[in-house]
């Protein structure tokens, strides 16, 4: 994919311990009901507090020099700033889209600086805010062909309770396996990893921690969708992911992965550790061992899932 040069992004203000992730993220969350005793903090956002809108509105935080978390608690939205503009990975859904846009601005960036919105897959919690953020920013929206079809179909299908269909973004860019996108010195490499959806998109890029580079990876669909076909696709995708060398940072699409929970803490547990980090301490998001452990867990789980799906289909 052709390298794109765009106008600059506003300089980021340092997000010091204003978000103080202990025991909760932000004043609204502190006033909310505590998570169930047996839940971890990240897990609570997809468990007991899944429908608690105010609890979900966590404060944004900086993870690396060039990576910010700007989503609600249950589903990730990642901002990748560069000197020539910013890239947004996923958008969350209503009623959280205004919160996402406010979080981008609180992190020191103008919405107009967003040049690209990359959608990891065609589920509403990941693409639901894309149309509104595109309208506010002028960004181009990108996804794989198979999930563009899912997104466009959702725009003509009534929502739950016969509510109107969600707003869907205009198709700007159709990504393919092996494509790259370059902006302001940052290059994203794209992979097609179906299984969660037919066109789940993964992303490889470099993050910097006080100038030190680390290989980061977004696995766009971390769980099988069901059925033999989905199970076969997911297992094949996990086996391909396992062959990608040198991944140190998992940029997960949910704070807590329900199918195969991420070992040694989800996004928000790691964010708590990051808020308490002292000079010279390692960044808790740089954790190649946990990535390898999770990949093996997901491979084993995918193999078992496929066996189970085949047994169901044979009945």
Predicted feature locations:
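Signal peptide processing junction and immediate N-terminal pro/mature segment
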Residues: 22-33
